[in-house]
Design a protein with these regions (language model features):
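Short, surface-exposed alpha-helix to beta-strand junction/turn motifs within ectodomains of secreted
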Residues: 399-440, 465-472, 481-484
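Beta-propeller domains with acidic blade repeats across secreted/periplasmic ectodomains
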Residues: 27-381, 386, 390-393, 404
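Bacterial N-terminal signal peptides that target proteins for export
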Residues: 2-14
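Short edge beta-strand/loop segments characteristic of extracellular beta-sandwich folds
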Residues: 395-401, 453
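Blade-terminus and WD-like Trp-Asp/Gly-His loop motifs, strongest in beta-propeller folds
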Residues: 443-446
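Short beta-strand elements
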Residues: 479-493
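Bacterial N-terminal signal peptides
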Residues: 11-23
Length: 493
């Protein structure tokens, strides 16, 4: 994540453009979703860094200070019967939490740990090392994130790069994504990460991670975890010879070129499935939660929800696979949370829990940490549900019927494309920007989709769609009227 000084380098260049398209809507102002803060007792410092629902009305939360707390009656509304009990303590900055059978698994700085309560008194009495050995130097920025489970029962972890060159020991796997079998066997999978805070699977079971704007990363991104992939940060390649990995180090880094050009020049380099344009869609990205609630969280089934730290918000991502590559659109979704969101977890009732802390970096909000629950009210909203690429444009699906007159007018669609520079400096402005002409707009018979034809689509570029001129059949404006589609592959005709 960025320091305040580093973030300030880009503020003046992006704020004006962001204000044109960003429609920041506080959580309490969104009638389709209600945010319920869970009051935390004064003796509990709930700086949430791991979060999972565990059934029977309870949620478990790991904290930066090395504790695991059980929140009882977590679904009580209003939350008057909440009770907090400490399950575990003494951990080294756990940054994730999952439950498997009757045990919790957390990733500490130095190891993946299994925690159990063998005598069933409500407190952990067994701490077992499952896997370790990825290397830690003591640098503050060497966070270890996870675990998250894949469908095969493997644990996935991601490892931060140290903040300065003095922190880079020759025998550490900093900047790597690793898979750990249930028996503790470590397999290094991919490299090139910077600050890979979020992990999660999509509806098809493929694993993804989020990374932060910084050196070699022009802005924040959502990346598909793939065997042998290199995501851009070269300092991770120090470990290439230490492990039996498929990652092939590029002979020369094409610094100064656009990321689209780098993807063509370096076979192992992988673009993100989605870029989150800086400031327009937050300043940082954290956890990943795939909506498999069966509609209990609204009209976005199978989509990803992604936490935002600095702006204390949640974003939404709609993915598709085109010519073997993931790509898709991101949207602002819900803001106004009480602190920076680090972890997300689905509740047993289909609600979404957000675990929060502003530790280390400033975030918007009224508190330093906390836990909130987001519930769909059932009220219809007018929003872009998905954007799908076509060989000559885009197919845009909405959550409610369109006003045909506004949606059939091609001048009501404003599009541009841009990309980022691959370099060792901190972040990148939007570069090589082009305005795109919409040559035709058509509305489907059921009025739920608009098909637009666009001149000048470009692979490897973000395509920004400003749709704020559209109206619903009832005359309503769009809830967040901009979509940001990362076009890695143009579909075949």
């Amino acid at each position: 994540m960025a320091t305040m000084r580093q973030m300030a380098q880009f503020e003046m260049g992006v704020v004006f453009a962001a204000l044109l398209c960003v429609q920041a809507l506080h959580a309490e102002e969104q009638p389709s979703y209600r945010v319920i803060p869970l009051p935390v007792p004064s003796h509990v410092i709930l700086e949430v860094t791991g979060l999972t629902a565990i059934g029977d009305g309870k949620v478990a939360a790991a904290t930066r200070r090395g504790e695991v707390w059980i929140v009882h009656n977590a679904y009580d509304n209003p939350p008057r019967a909440l009770r907090f009990s400490r399950f575990a303590y003494g951990l080294h900055e756990p940054l994730g939490l999952v439950q498997v059978d009757n045990a919790f698994f957390v990733t500490q700085r130095t190891e993946l740990t299994r925690i159990r309560d063998r005598d069933q008194d409500g407190e952990a009495d067994e701490y077992i090392t499952v896997a370790k050995g990825w290397g830690v130097t003591g640098n503050y920025h060497e966070y270890a994130y996870g675990p998250r489970l894949d469908r095969a029962g493997n644990f996935w972890l991601t490892l931060n790069i140290g903040m300065d060159k003095n922190a880079l020991g020759p025998h550490t796997w900093r900047g790597w994504g690793i898979r750990v079998s249930p028996r503790g066997r470590i397999t290094p999978v991919c490299a090139g990460m910077r600050s890979p805070c979020g992990l999660g699977a999509n509806a098809d079971g493929d694993m993804f991670y989020t990374d932060q704007q910084g050196r070699w990363f022009g802005t924040n991104g959502l990346f598909h975890l793939q065997q042998g992939a290199f995501y851009g940060h070269p300092e991770s390649l120090r470990a290439e010879d230490l492990v039996n990995s498929d990652v092939v180090a590029p002979k020369k880094l094409p610094e100064g070129k656009t990321v689209a050009e780098v993807a063509r020049l370096v076979p192992s380099y992988r673009l993100p499935a989605v870029w989150f344009p800086y400031e327009k869609v937050g300043r940082s990205v954290t956890d990943i939660a795939c909506d498999q609630t069966g509609g209990r969280y609204g009209p976005f089934s199978s989509q990803l929800f992604v936490g935002g730290f600095v702006h204390s918000e949640v974003f939404r991502v709609a993915l598709e696979k085109v010519r073997g590559e993931y790509q898709g659109a991101c949207f602002r979704f819900l803001s106004g949370f009480q602190a920076g969101i680090v972890r997300l977890a689905w509740g047993e009732d289909g609600s979404l829990f957000a675990g929060e802390t502003n530790r280390g970096w400033n975030s918007r909000g009224t508190r330093s940490y906390g836990l909130e629950r987001v519930v769909w009210t059932g009220r219809e909203l007018f929003a872009v549900r998905t954007v799908r690429a076509r060989s000559d444009g885009f197919l845009i699906e909405f959550t409610s019927a369109l006003d045909v007159e506004s949606a059939a007018r091609k001048t009501n669609y404003s599009l541009k494309s841009y990309t980022y520079t691959y370099h060792s400096r901190y972040g990148s402005p939007e570069v090589d920007t082009r305005q795109l002409a919409v040559t035709r707009a058509r509305v489907s018979q059921d009025r739920m989709r608009a098909r637009i034809e666009v001149d000048g689509l470009r692979e490897g570029y973000v395509h920004e769609l400003d749709l704020r001129a559209l109206r619903s059949a009832q005359g309503h404006e769009l809830d967040h009227g901009c979509a940001y589609y990362t076009l890695n592959r143009i579909p075949s005709p």
